[in-house]
Amino acid sequence: MSCPRAVHSAATIGNHLLFAGGYNSTTGKYLSTVESYDASLTRSTAVELSSAKNGLASATVGEYAMFAGGYKGNSDAAYVATVDAYNTALTKTTMPDLSVGRYGLASAVIGDYALFAGGISKISSTADKYQDVVDVYSA
């Protein structure tokens, strides 16, 4: 990888494996980079996420690898609702937002649907909320 990272997410699309976002403890920065490895393990960089974040979830359904939610720092706007999607050509598309910005959410695919469930969001300057919401995206 191009830098140390943790709390990132991974997905496959076509002949590509993507690692997205995360946190670099060496620099103390959240990451927006998306690194791609092809079937011959050649590394390249895809178009960046819409914002630097960690704690995001990923799922691949149909033509898209999706990276949803995340956390981007200590502020009221730190809980991200954005869903960035990459096709087999590694072209980025932004999908409709999650219903609630959150991080630490889980993801799974069933049939033609990607589900993003749970996670943590902010309800006040001193309190987090554990979510029971499930957002569904179709192929």
Model regions: which residues?
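Kelch-like beta-propeller repeat domains
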Residues: 1-139
